[in-house]
Amino acid sequence: METRTLEDWRALLEAEKTLDSGVYNKHDLLIVRGQGARVWDAEGNEYIDCVGGYGVANLGHGNPEVVEAVKRQAETLMAMPQTLPTPMRGEFYRTLTAILPPELNRVFPVNSGTEANEAALKFARAHTGRKKFVAAMRGFSGRTMGSLSVTWEPKYREPFLPLVEPVEFIPYNDVEALKRAVDEETAAVILEPVQGEGGVRPATPEFLRAAREITQEKGALLILDEIQTGMGRTGKRFAFEHFGIVPDILTLAKALGGGVPLGVAVMREEVARSMPKGGHGTTFGGNPLAMAAGVAAIRYLERTRLWERAAELGPWFMEKLRAIPSPKIREVRGMGLMVGLELKEKAAPYIARLEKEHRVLALQAGPTVIRFLPPLVIEKEDLERVVEAVRAVLA
């Protein structure tokens, strides 16, 4: 293994900052290694990771079973288009659909969450022959042109208008607004069971159940975006299980590949059959390397039942945060280990202090919300340290 000096690391950090497109606000550190719920920077500092790759690292950084599966597959076959079947693709399809409701039995594999949502929107139009989409205020579905069209935040959308139209945005958890919006021109309603970027806001059972009923009544599809909520994050395998409904299309990504880029749109058979041959495509989607990672990730999740850990630790963590006696806290909310701490002021300075003073990595979810997405393998003692760090920066 190549040995690098601290000067080498600093040069690489500078290279990333100077040669990057500039789209991202970069932290002033270089992460070089991760294991479980911990990561280390080039100077050897250890951090508790509550960013988790924006929800990618549910199974922990460097999960040994995923690593071994990727190594083994890389030695055999890494790339093959979907027109040429491979054993690992069939294995992945079989493994994934086995843990889903029987209605969701057709898989379109891609590389990311935004691609999964792009596919879902196209399948919805192909199936219904309609154009309109209904989405939620504060909802986030991606930044490519189709998924951006059903993403609420104006700062993301407005510079790139015109986008896919028509799209009608409704207040999240407003059943009456949903009833008014969904009509005979609606192809699909797309919703997150818990809004992530929008401030970690869980749906009410009444809202999601109404979405299922209304779409069925109007002949529209229900797309559930579980890019961030899937793979055990909310205390169930998939968040829709909390609500007793099954969507027409389910989109997954982030943790699905155990750290390897992998996304899917999983749908009902009749929806899949509506897409004409060649109506959608992807070069890398379904590649054997990602398929092997996905199989290993699902099998690890199933064997360890990490969603039960999220169901246990998440409420405990939220109660500990609520017990912090700070007038700066407005609300603590979430589902499982998807947790938002809303402040009465801007969150960014406190997130920076968590990193610099306490070696805790967290992220924003809107201007005033600190979001915690730790790997589901995190130890309770680490979460206790996170609580104490939050207590200290809010003092």
Swiss-Prot record:
Coiled coil: none
Disruption phenotype: Auxotroph for lysine.
GO MF term (any one): identical protein binding
Binding positions for substrate per the UniProt entry: 143, 282
Family note: Belongs to the class-III pyridoxal-phosphate-dependent aminotransferase family. LysJ subfamily.
Keyword Calcium attached: no
Subcellular location: Cytoplasm
Reported function: Catalyzes the transfer of the amino group of L-glutamate to [LysW]-aminoadipate 6-semialdehyde, generating [LysW]-gamma-L-lysine. In vitro, can use N(2)-acetyl-L-ornithine and N(2)-acetyl-L-lysine.
InterPro entries: AcOrn/SuccOrn_fam, Aminotrans_3, Aminotrans_3_PPA_site, Class-III_PLP-dep_AT, Class-III_PLP_Aminotransferase, LysJ, PyrdxlP-dep_Trfase, PyrdxlP-dep_Trfase_major
Its EC number(s): 2.6.1.118
Reaction(s) the record says it catalyses: [amino-group carrier protein]-C-terminal-gamma-(L-lysyl)-L-glutamate + 2-oxoglutarate = [amino-group carrier protein]-C-terminal-N-(1-carboxy-5-oxopentan-1-yl)-L-glutamine + L-glutamate
One of the GO biological process terms: lysine biosynthetic process via aminoadipic acid
Keyword tags: Amino-acid biosynthesis, Aminotransferase, Cytoplasm, Lysine biosynthesis, Pyridoxal phosphate, Transferase
The protein's name in its UniProt record: [LysW]-aminoadipate semialdehyde transaminase
Pfam families referenced in this protein's UniProt entry, alphabetically: Aminotran_3 (PF00202)
Disulfide bonds: none
Modified residues (N6-(pyridoxal phosphate)lysine): 254
Organism: Thermus thermophilus (strain ATCC BAA-163 / DSM 7039 / HB27)
Gene3D superfamilies the UniProt entry points to: Aspartate Aminotransferase, domain 1 (3.90.1150.10), Type I PLP-dependent aspartate aminotransferase-like (Major domain) (3.40.640.10)
GO cellular component: cytoplasm
Subunit structure: Homodimer.
Cofactors demanded by this protein: pyridoxal 5'-phosphate
Cofactor note: Binds 1 pyridoxal phosphate per subunit.
CDD domains per the UniProt record, alphabetical: OAT_like
Pathway assignment: Amino-acid biosynthesis; L-lysine biosynthesis via AAA pathway; L-lysine from L-alpha-aminoadipate (Thermus route): step 4/5
Residues that coordinate or bind pyridoxal 5'-phosphate: 113-114, 140, 225-228, 283
UniProt cross-references to NCBIfam families, sorted A to Z: argD, LysJ_Th_th
